[in-house]
Amino acid sequence: MTDDPGTQMAVLEEGPEIEPGQVLLQAEHLRKYFPIKHGVLIQREVARVHAVDDVSFELRAGETLGLVGESGCGKSTLARCISRIYDLSGGTLTFEGRDISRSSRRQLRPVRRDLQMVFQDPYASLNPRKRVGAIIADPLRIHHAGNREQIRTRVIELLEVVGLSAEHVNRYPHEFSGGQRQRIGVARALALRPKLVIADEPVSALDVSIRAQVINLLDDLQDDLGLTYIFIAHDLGVVRHVSDRIAVMYLGKIVEISPAEELYERPVHPYTEALLSAVPVPDPDLSAQRQQIVLEGDVPSPISPPSGCRFHPRCRYATDICKVEEPQLTLRGSAGHLAACHHPLSVGTAPPESAAAVVTGQ
């Protein structure tokens, strides 16, 4: 690379041109297992945590893919696999046409400019010993993106983009509110002009009163900068607002993926149905009329997941085939709506004696 800082900045802004609608990221059979070892002097693997198990999807430039599911279903682990914070246990990950599945840290360096993360906790993700200007400037310095003056100009520009001002550059994280800290995290993620931003539950640690501000900021930035998002959350109301498509995860697997509105209007997988039944409805009359599906029991252990369909111990539609044969993601309904279920809701299968109770929402 040239030693001229101005040239370095120009090189940073260039990269493979992916037109809106073209595939930016493709995941095929991704797996991430965490070994459980036992022993003192000689440790041996006695079990594995199946955190992400055979996950496949593609993401097109300019779209937002929402990723939802209960706590512990593997959403955040999948995000860290995509960003290559974690090494993969198996599968193939392609970004901008390049296979990055087994790339070394050095080989990943140019990829990280185009793939950034916004983390869940704005309190823990910012170094309390650094001033805000230095935090946002870190990616620029690491990637040699200009001289000192160019970096300072870029930092001030980023602060203004996320709704802060130049006067905040010398303050420390503890001097900001939770919403402002998350804006700083967004500014840091945007520093290198990425193509893909993975937002890992970016509003779950914030007060309800300021969640909408951060969501609207991310929405506006996508329109202005042409960003592509993977938006992770457990709040399906939030995901519906920001997503073009939504993938539902359960115990390390994607069980349904669909255009956002169709998922909410016509869910196919029983787990999705249960999640949607728990979403609050602002109209008290409608809320009183609809049914809430209460899943009994806890999520099974990812160390020893159930055979067949992983959801069958809690599913009110489960039959014998669900216990022995694992369902595959299959096209259901319109193009792009896939679900992994032996008894999809569209078939209208009457539920047998169930592992769940159905109660009228109060």
Predicted stretch roles:
Residues 195-198, 202-206, 210-288:
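P-loop NTP-binding/switch modules centered on Walker-like glycine-rich loops
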Residues 98-99, 149-167, 273-277:
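Conserved ABC ATPase "signature" region
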Residues 68-69:
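The feature captures the beta-strand-to-loop junction immediately N-terminal to the Walker
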